[in-house]
């Protein structure tokens, strides 16, 4: 199956923003020049034994996404890479794919050359394998690695925690093997000049776990609510001003 399309991510300043502490930034997928609202879900492994998932199951899952009026699926970085059958079904049904590399929630030994060699090999293989799927809209460096590092260390300074992976190794693999596909350093990630918080509301994508935890993870503290129950109420989603909520934290 062939597909001719352009996919861009608009991260330009939001001129309609009230400019509190400077303008926020858009995070919008532009398909063939047309902004597309991303409606979808995160894909976690369908089975504890990934090899048991059949091509027909992948096809049926993507068809269900289409029937649910989804436009995008995010392949979550704490699971497994999408199969060829899954990606082909996304091509067939017109479902865009945000695909994390398989790194999640912890620091990685960027100073271990044997490990880094494995990372380069994996990134090269996966970007080549999936390069020809028109549904592939974006590669993200991983899931919550930057967010967790910032939460613990209060910075994103370069160092042997994996920064080289997300800032150099992975984007180089995408540029080399899949140059028409967008790259985003992590999920969530930010434009630090606009919003230094990795999981903030003014730039980039964010993971909205406030409802699950009833606590602040970037969109306001529980003290803004009259009770813990109110802080965890699903109505809280309607107050979230995140630019692009790529994970809602409800299973």
Located regions from the model:
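Substrate-binding/catalytic cleft of secreted carbohydrate-active enzymes
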Residues: 72-92, 96-251
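Active-site-adjacent substrate/metal-binding segments within catalytic domains
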Residues: 1-106, 115-138
């Amino acid at each position: 199956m062939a597909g001719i399309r352009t996919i861009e991510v608009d991260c330009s300043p939001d001129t309609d923003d009230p400019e509190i502490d400077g303008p926020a930034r858009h995070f919008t997928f532009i398909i063939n020049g047309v902004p597309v609202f991303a409606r979808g879900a995160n894909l976690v492994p369908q089975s504890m034994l990934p090899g048991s998932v059949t091509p027909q199951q992948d096809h049926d899952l993507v068809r269900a996404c289409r029937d649910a009026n989804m436009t995008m699926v995010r392949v979550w970085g704490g699971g497994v890479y999408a199969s060829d059958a899954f990606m082909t079904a996304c091509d067939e049904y017109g479902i865009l794919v945000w695909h994390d590399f398989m790194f999640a929630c912890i620091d990685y030994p960027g100073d271990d050359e044997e490990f880094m060699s494995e990372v380069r090999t994996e990134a090269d293989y996966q970007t080549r394998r999936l390069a020809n799927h028109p549904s592939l809209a974006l590669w993200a460096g991983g899931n919550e690695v930057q967010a967790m590092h910032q939460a613990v260390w209060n910075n994103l300074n370069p160092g042997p925690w994996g920064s080289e992976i997300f800032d150099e190794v992975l984007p180089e693999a995408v540029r080399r093997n899949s140059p028409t596909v967008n790259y985003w350093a992590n999920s969530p990630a930010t434009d630090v000049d606009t919003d230094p918080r990795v999981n903030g509301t003014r730039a980039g994508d964010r993971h909205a776990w406030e409802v699950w935890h009833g606590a602040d993870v970037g969109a306001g503290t529980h003290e803004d609510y009259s009770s813990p129950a109110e802080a965890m109420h699903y109505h809280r989603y309607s107050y979230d001003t995140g630019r692009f909520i790529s994970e809602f934290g409800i299973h």
